[in-house]
């Protein structure tokens, strides 16, 4: 690959802010088959695309950069490929394909096949691009070869430790949130039970007061004859008890005062 910066040297830098913004790179990120991909498209005078692929567990990395069309052909010997026309995929087109893939909107004529694993961290990884021509048996085959990015074991250890710590913090945060939700639920249930209990006591008191008032009202409207009948019933019940009769006899025996017939 030619030096992109060298190609851009003759270009003058536009100091207008709006012009500067149009040269800001576009970056997308997605994960496929246990590999995290960061794709950057640079809108410089010579547009280029840079792809970084990192294994999410082992943190080995591979990368690919180009400002040219993707023309890596996979050799085939089929008759349909004898008169084939090479399909040009320039950096911007490739970036748009990755964007569509991420958004699940890639055209049916294109297929991107990503690595599922790696043999060793020194082995290149390939992303395959299959393009099917409508009404034709011809399928265009291309691939992008990502080369190893050097990384020390110490840096890998730091990345693994950082990820483990992040996962631990996320799990701890989740458990704390779950506990808060459980506590809030218990608090609400206790408050609801307390409210139901208070309401039940309130209704019980109101019913008691209502019944008591009703009894007082009934008692107040009774006639003198009805009241005497009630008294008579109580006395008969009282006198029917032998113990009560004994108390009366003892009281009369120990008393010097007797009621006369007229007093009765």
Curated annotation (Swiss-Prot):
What family is this protein classified in? Belongs to the mimivirus R73/L269/L862 family.
Protein name, please?
A: Uncharacterized protein L269
Superkingdom to which the source organism belongs:
Viruses
Native species = Acanthamoeba polyphaga mimivirus (APMV)
What are the boundaries of the region Disordered?
1-20
């Amino acid at each position: 690959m030619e030096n992109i910066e060298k190609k851009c040297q003759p270009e003058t830098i536009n100091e207008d802010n709006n012009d500067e913004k149009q040269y800001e790179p576009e970056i997308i990120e997605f994960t496929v088959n246990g590999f995290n991909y960061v794709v950057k498209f640079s809108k410089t005078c010579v547009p280029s695309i840079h792809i970084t692929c990192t294994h999410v567990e082992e943190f080995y990395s591979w990368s690919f950069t180009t400002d040219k069309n993707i023309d890596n052909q996979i050799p085939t010997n089929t008759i349909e490929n004898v008169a084939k026309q090479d399909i040009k995929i320039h950096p911007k087109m490739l970036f748009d394909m990755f964007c569509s893939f991420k958004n699940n909107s890639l055209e049916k004529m294109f297929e991107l096949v990503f690595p599922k694993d790696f043999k060793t961290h020194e082995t290149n990884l390939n992303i395959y691009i299959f393009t099917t021509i409508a009404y034709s048996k011809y399928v265009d085959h291309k691939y992008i070869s990502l080369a190893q990015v050097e990384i020390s074991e110490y840096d890998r250890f730091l990345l693994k430790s950082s990820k483990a710590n992040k996962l631990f913090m996320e799990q701890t945060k989740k458990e704390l949130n779950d506990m808060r939700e459980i506590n809030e639920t218990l608090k609400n249930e206790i408050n609801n039970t307390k409210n139901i209990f208070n309401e039940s006591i309130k209704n019980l008191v109101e019913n008691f007061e209502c019944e008591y008032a009703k009894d007082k009202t009934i008692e107040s409207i009774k006639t003198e004859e009805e009241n005497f009948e009630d008294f008579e019933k109580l006395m008969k019940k009282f006198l029917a008890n032998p113990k009560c009769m004994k108390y009366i006899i003892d009281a009369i025996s120990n008393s010097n005062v007797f009621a006369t017939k007229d007093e009765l």
